[in-house]
Amino acid sequence: MDSDLSPQDKKDLDKFIKFFALKTVQVIVQARLGEKISTCSSSSPTGSDWFNLAIKDIPEVTHEAKKALAGQLPGIGRSMCVEISLKTSEGDSMELETWCLEMNEKCDKDIKVSYTVYNRLSLLLKSLLAITRVTPAYKLSRQQGHDYVILYRIYFGDVQLTGLGEGFQTVRVGIVGTPIGTITLSCAYRTNLALVSSRQFERTGPIMGIIIDHFVERPFTNMAHTHPCSYRAPGEDDGGTYAGIEDSQEVCTTSFSTSPPSQLYSSRLSYQTPPLGTVDLCHPTACTGAAHPHQMVVPGKDGGIPQVPAQPNHGTGAEQGRIPSCPTGQPPQLPPPTSCSSEVKTVSPSDVLETTFTRKVGAFVNKATTQVTTTGLDLPFAAFAPRSYDMEENDPMVHPPPSPIPSSPLQGSLHSNNSSHSGGQPNDDFVMVDFKPAFSKDDLLPMDLGTFYREFQNPPQLASLSIDVSAQSMAEDLDSLPEKLAVYEKNIDEFDAFVDTLQ
């Protein structure tokens, strides 16, 4: 297929595909770091600014991508995939999405490699920047912390979608035709985010206590003094890797410093569709009993039935939070790489208190006192305001001043009835303000805009169009008609002579 390409075009196309694959991995992984990325444009781009985009490469990600490619390029039958997964503090994992860069046999031999293919790959990369921030995994990555982390894995070969569970959806980011094939970039993401723990069928007590129903007593009250689990030891370097994780599966480096606990509680999984809410791991024996109006049973991938409550009820947040914990001296057990589970949402009591406090912050929580001084007000012209006043008694909007008496009957007739009586009613909805607008020509007729509009909207009827006047004039014409006809008959010869002159 590439026999028609010149050596230079073939070299350029291979280079474009190679760097596009590397930039694709960078965009996907950086979108799952859990933090917003802001880059500044530059008038003098450097050699690393491929496809006219200022994407700063992470060396570890580039190393993993090159190791996965192993000198190969995505081609026909050879796909490069980036798998995004979630791992909880208890060792449960769940695949979230798989991004696939592949090529099919459909060729576009008339396309120019140096300009057209390069520019279209740039547009496809920009589309990828947008699509990576609208899939469900983006919201999860923004909330990662001590409860779970987001992992990625790069592999080269056949696409593996079995770990996404049933009902996963696919989206095509875009396609770019080349002389050797059509490059296709697509994504398959999980829609069922219910978590099934690998240890939920054990007879030992659960590591974390979750409230199944806020109308029932709190279970596991002795768990309030436990501490959250963590993959990293306290003295471990930030640049280290998690224990038990393969070298090809990197951990986002900012997974533990991006979201405070209060944000984890308030906005966890807010991206989901209305029937799905935050996913909680329930007790094995309590999962069968079920359901509260704010909860929903969602079958897990392995047959489990986790509880999926909707949004937390106001006033019950302190009863629903628990700290994920693990037994002393026992490290978290890691499941096999092929096991799939979903995210566990837990919060500490301090998170609930902080969330409750932030909900009370507002402009209308406490009723303002009646007496207000100018020192407590943020007035733009505080120097011109009175020293002290009462809001209810002296407020001109509540008790408007009486309207001045019109200086002339004509001026008084132009005021509406509602405005003329506004001075005697302290609770009127309208306040009459007398002023002289620019469209009022004389000082004797100062009218507001509403009066001005109403006067011209309903003008008085013309006297010539009056019914009485028109009827009277018609009767007079009928009475004088015989006299006019007699005059015309008398002068008929003159009219005939005038008509002859016109011919």
UniProtKB/Swiss-Prot annotation:
Where does the record place Low complexity bias?
Answer: 408-425
Keywords attached to this entry: Autophagy, Cytoplasm
List all Pro residues biased stretches: 329-338, 398-407
Q: Where is this region: Disordered?
A: 300-345, 392-428
Question: Superkingdom of the source?
Answer: Eukaryota
One GO BP annotation here? Answer: regulation of autophagy
Main location (coarse class): cytoplasm
A single GO cellular-component term on record: cytosol
Pfam families recorded: ATG13
- What is an example of a GO molecular function annotated in this UniProt entry? protein kinase regulator activity
Cellular localization per UniProt: Cytoplasm, Cytosol; Preautophagosomal structure
Query: In what way is this protein post-translationally modified?
Result: Phosphorylated under nutrient-rich conditions; dephosphorylated during starvation or following treatment with rapamycin.
- Similarity remark: Belongs to the ATG13 family. Metazoan subfamily.
**What task does this protein carry out?**
Autophagy factor required for autophagosome formation. Target of the TOR kinase signaling pathway that regulates autophagy through the control of the phosphorylation status of ATG13 and ULK1, and the regulation of the ATG13-ULK1-RB1CC1 complex.
In Swiss-Prot or TrEMBL terms, this protein is called: Autophagy-related protein 13
Origin species, per record, is: Danio rerio (Zebrafish)
User: What taxonomic lineage is listed for the species of origin?
Assistant: Eukaryota, Metazoa, Chordata, Craniata, Vertebrata
